[in-house]
A protein has these predicted regions:
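Charge-rich, well-structured scaffold segments of protease-associated domains
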Residues: 2, 15, 25-29, 46, ...
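Short hydrophobic "helix-edge" motifs at membrane interfaces and signal-peptide entry regions
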Residues: 9, 80-82, 206
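Bacterial N-terminal signal peptides
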Residues: 9-19
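Active/ligand-binding-proximal structured segments within catalytic/core domains
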Residues: 55, 64-111
């Protein structure tokens, strides 16, 4: 009787195991990903958009959960627009634009820090340059004044001394990046992906030789051609 009980228990246990094994062996159902267009439609961020008489596009998103405003200016200029011999200009101006303007001389960050701004920075890229800060709502007028002054009146503050200083900063940035472990791999990737005359064929930071050769007139001409309100988008949230 004892052996019979053990045998029956074993059969019962195997009976329990069989469905589990069958389930484990069944192929998992394939879930087809949703089309990207459908996913984009689900991102519903309300905003208003208008264009000022000077050509500046303005996009405003209102969310009053916190008394702050994110201010972001996107310039439609990046390294892909740089001609041969002028590489690194977009990145150079990302630095120059934080060095003061005609009606707001000195460090761009200082007056914003005084009103409690956070997230202050700028980023150059292949296709665009972006400057941004987040300020308390009462300081929005101050932030817009500073942005408008460096958009329209930057060049009066760009002297040969300022150019030389910021040129040196950018070149030092490049040296630091190049001398990190694997720092040169980006150049190998660009060489492998694009031809030398392709807009993406050179790095955003540019070459030391091109930066050395840049004159004050070259730099000012670059700004006049690319940093006007009709080539920018102001985003407020």
């Amino acid at each position: 009787m004892h052996l019979r009980s053990i045998a029956l228990s074993g059969v019962a246990f195997c009976a329990l195991l069989t469905p589990l094994a069958a389930t484990a062996q069944a192929p998992a159902a394939t879930v087809k990903p949703a089309p990207v267009a459908d996913l984009i439609k689900k991102v519903d961020i309300a905003y208003n958009e208008f264009t000022l008489p000077n050509g500046l596009r303005v996009i405003v998103h209102t969310d009053r959960k916190a008394p702050v405003v994110a201010v972001s200016v996107w310039y439609n200029i990046g390294s892909k627009f740089e001609p041969k011999g002028r590489t690194g200009f977009a990145h150079l101006f990302e630095h120059l634009m934080f060095n003061g303007s005609e009606n707001a001389p000195g460090d761009f960050f200082d007056p914003l820090k005084q009103v409690g701004a956070t997230e202050l920075n700028g980023t150059p890229n292949y296709d665009r340059t972006n400057d941004f800060e987040t300020v308390p709502t009462p300081a929005l007028e101050k932030a817009l004044f500073l942005e408008s002054d460096r958009m329209g009146y930057l060049l009066g503050a760009v002297t040969q001394e300022v150019l030389d200083e910021q040129r040196g900063v950018v070149q030092n940035e490049k040296r630091q990046g190049d001398n990190r472990p694997y720092g040169l791999i980006q150049y190998k990737l660009l060489d492998g992906l694009f031809s030398s005359d392709h807009p993406y064929g050179h790095s955003v930071i540019g070459s030391l030789a091109d930066l050395d050769a840049a004159s004050l007139d070259d730099v000012k001409g670059w700004f006049r051609n690319h940093y006007g309100p009709n080539n920018a988008v102001l985003v407020l949230a």
